């Protein structure tokens, strides 16, 4: 049984009883309850009898201001900025990469300790905008073109050219990286 969740949505409510609401660590906490004494966060998910969580994007996405965590901007993360970096707004310290990495790994390990598999939702069909590291590395190579214009079949613009050998290699290596490291 697979349950789709968002790191932010799963514990952000003030009644969730977690120490780190809306964060990787919030989902790693055990023994959390709401005011009514009902299980929340990880314990709630475990009580559902699920076998896997499919976590909405947790790679670095663009439209959340990581410098203003109290601002509570909302986004599910389908605006990729860097495919191989954990999202900073879900960490307790977005300015230090090692914190993002450690806390995301702690969350995933907590799921595994409970016998829950983790499926990572990664959107490799587009990037947030054309001011991406891919575009800066090799202009127009990593993006699908329709003549002289950028293709927009994904309805997001900035459509990734997965048919390009190096883009395909990048995607495969990225998936392998996440599976191996997390």
Where are the model-predicted features located?
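Basic K/R-rich, polyanion-interacting modules in nucleoproteins and related proteins
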Residues: 1
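Active-site ligand-binding patch in enzyme domains
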Residues: 5
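Substrate-binding/active-site clefts of carbohydrate-active enzymes
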Residues: 8-182
